[in-house]
Structures are given as structure tokens and as C-alpha cells.
Amino acid sequence: MDKAMKITRRQCQLAFFSAAVVVICVCIGVTMNLTTVADENFDHMGLRTFCMFTVNSNILCAAAMAMVIPYTLDGLRTHNYHMPRWIVDLVYMGVTAVALTFLVSLFILSPAKGFVLIFTGSRFFLHGVCPLLAIVAFCFFMSEKRLTFRDMLLALIPVLIYTIVYYVMVAVVGEEKGGWNDFYGFLSRLPHWIPLSAIMPLTFLIALGIRVLHNRSYDRRKAAESAFYTALFADADVRKIVAALARSHSSAKILDIVIPTRVISIMLEHSKSDCTLEECCEIYLKEYLENSQVLNLEKYWI
């Protein structure tokens, strides 16, 4: 059982550290842009930096990663790592957006402006480190849920919104009337229909690639977990294991009693026991209370 807990703990640790590094690096990159008064190569510094897709995509990704952190910490505390579907979808959106940022920077902006220019300064974080780390983290450390076709369509929404806003501000409003200049150069150097017809199919392919990597990681992890838990619990007495698990957790001096239903469900799924989840939860709670070191709660009543 200790090994099962270690698997969950390692997954939580990797997800926590990768999410935290993405958040920190995005904060560094955006702060560098905000505090740069002028840049001879990029005119969108200071508050104008929020016009750029690079910055907005990284902020979205960092915000989504920040929402992952509380669930990883809770997983470390309770040994029951779980993320809601809506957070998985939000992270998927952010990762798809920064993946587009990375690929455009690498294959379009770098040949035009030079690799060193595109991947130095704040752009080292926003064009390179954050997108790559976010992709790796989501595909390999946060593959707790399988991505569906619906999830993939949702991942396209941020890029679609920015595409519409960019076109309106550049081509419809125009810089002379308070809009934006074509700082990416896609509309001034090419017929409008080319970038407009290419951006969403490209984003779709990126989202598809991320989904394939994520789901393969999910399938591998589930297969490994299934083999491990089947070997561990096939002939085991689940009732005794749940009781032992409760006794080991009861030594922790915490007031909230958290029953690890996910772990118990996995045990039941891979065992031949006739015990139900409800019965296991009752066994856990009873054993926990009988062995808990925090039974005197009178001083905590308000």
C-alpha cells in the first residue's frame, strides 16, 4: 500500500513543481515587459504588452497552472489526487495557446528576426521556457483525465477570440483610429485570407497533437496502475487493508478526516472482494476514530 501512496505522491510533486515553475517564469517574463520602457526591436512594451498574444497566452496558461497547485497540495495531504474537469480544460486551453506561441516564434518569427532576438530577454521565458515546460507538464504530469474531442474544441476558443480581436483592431479599426498596428506583420505582408484561413487549422493540429500525447500518457499510466494494483490486491483482504490505512493516517494531527475514496475504489476495482465502497468508508472512519490522536475537539468549538 505504501508503494501505491508513493505513486500518487510522486505525481502530485511533479505536477506541483512544474506548475509552480510555469507561474514563476510567466511572472518574470511579463514583469520584464512591463518594466521595459522602450525596446528598439519591439514597440509593445509597458502596458501595451497586453496587446500581444504571446503575453496573453502565457498569462492564461499561468493562471490555469496556478489553479492546479491547490489540488496537488491537497493530493499530497490526503493521498487522493484529483482535478475537476473544468480545470483540466482550462489548462488544455492555456497549453494549446502557448504551444502556438512557441511554434510561431520558432518557425516564423525566428527566421524573420533572428533566433537570438526572439529567444532572449523576456522572450526567453514567454517564447521558450514557459511553453515547453507547460506542454511537458500537461502531457506527462497532469494526465489524470482522458481528453475528449469536445475538450479539444474548447481548447481552440482563446485563439479564436484573439484572432477576431486582432483582426478587428488592426484591419477594421486601424492604428490611426485608436486600434493596433500590425505588430505581427501577418496582415500587412500577406493577403488577409491566408493568415485567417490558416490560424485555426494550425491551432486544431496543435491541440490534436497535445491531446494524443496527453492521452497516451494517460493510457500508459492507467495500464501500469492497473497491473500494479491487480498484482497487489487480487487476493488481498480489502477490509483489513482499509483498516490498516486508516490506522496509519490516524497518527496525523489534523482535524479534517478525509477518506481516500479514490484509493479505496481502485483497491475494490482490482480485487475479488465483495466489500462495497460504502462499507470500506465506514471501516475507515471507525478505525480512524478509534486510533486518532485528535479526539478532544472541545477547544476548537466556537
Task: Label every model-predicted segment.
Residues P131-T148:
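Alpha-helical transmembrane segments in multipass membrane proteins, preferentially the mid-helix core
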Residues H79-A97, T148-L156:
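Interfacial segments of alpha-helical transmembrane regions
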Residues V23-T31, V98-F107, V159-M169:
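Aromatic-anchored segments of alpha-helical transmembrane domains
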Residues H44-M52, G114-L126, R150-D151:
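Non-cytosolic membrane-interface motifs at loop->transmembrane helix junctions
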Residues T31-E40, L106-F115:
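Juxtamembrane "helix-exit" motif on the non-cytosolic side of transmembrane helices
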Residues C51, A171-L213:
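Membrane-interface transmembrane-helix boundary segments in multi-pass integral membrane proteins
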Residues Y218-L232:
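Short, highly charged, low-complexity non-transmembrane loops/tails of multi-pass membrane proteins
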Residues K3-A20:
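N-terminal membrane topogenic signal
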